[in-house]
Amino acid sequence: MMKHDIEKVLISEEEIQKKVKELGAELTSEYQDTFPLAIGVLKGALPFMADLIKHIDTYLEMDFMDVSSYGNSTVSSGEVKIIKDLDTSVEGRDILIIEDIIDSGLTLSYLVELFRYRKAKSIKIVTLLDKPSGRKADIKADFVGFEVPDAFVVGYGLDYAERYRNLPYIGVLKPAVYES
């Protein structure tokens, strides 16, 4: 059972849903008179994005990118790879990047530069989790759900080797799981 691999629950399902609702209200206000392109960063942001968009009461378009700087490792390789690109042009659009966690910041820094190059009108970032202690790139989210400590967190989209994404909460993974 997955729960035996979790050292502790860091953020409960109830806390997540409350924060998602608050972020949705902020984003409704931010994008009230626009038609933003909400870009979910796969795979991790999928549960967060699915819940978040239900609370954004304005028109928006959705698309997804799959990019990675981790592979199956716990440490960013520093090299960002596009696995799935957008189907939609960002040129002249207000872009909202929806991310599960900002750790090294390398992936988001790459995406922001890519969308600038592709001539996006504006770029904002919403992340469920922010881990400033892991930062290697100078990047900040415009909207943050929770700040998390320097621990390996999983659940609600976040994984280790493609496992634990389906936990309904954010938990700290026992080191024995990823150190073996």
Swiss-Prot record:
It catalyses: IMP + diphosphate = hypoxanthine + 5-phospho-alpha-D-ribose 1-diphosphate; GMP + diphosphate = guanine + 5-phospho-alpha-D-ribose 1-diphosphate. GO terms for molecular function: guanine phosphoribosyltransferase activity; hypoxanthine phosphoribosyltransferase activity; magnesium ion binding; nucleotide binding. It is found in: Cytoplasm. Pathway: Purine metabolism; IMP biosynthesis via salvage pathway; IMP from hypoxanthine: step 1/1; Purine metabolism; GMP biosynthesis via salvage pathway; GMP from guanine: step 1/1. Signal peptide: none annotated. The keyword Amino-acid biosynthesis does not apply. InterPro entries: HGPRT (IPR050408), Hxn_phspho_trans (IPR005904), PRibTrfase_dom (IPR000836), PRTase-like (IPR029057). The active site is at D103. GMP binds at K131, F152, V153, D159. Its main location: cytoplasm. Keywords: Cytoplasm, Glycosyltransferase, Magnesium, Metal-binding, Nucleotide-binding, Purine salvage, Transferase. The keyword Iron does not apply. CDD domains: PRTases_typeI. It comes from the Bacteria. Purine salvage pathway enzyme that catalyzes the transfer of the ribosyl-5-phosphate group from 5-phospho-alpha-D-ribose 1-diphosphate (PRPP) to the N9 position of the 6-oxopurines hypoxanthine and guanine to form the corresponding ribonucleotides IMP (inosine 5'-monophosphate) and GMP (guanosine 5'-monophosphate), with the release of PPi. Belongs to the purine/pyrimidine phosphoribosyltransferase family. This is Hypoxanthine-guanine phosphoribosyltransferase. The gene is hprT.
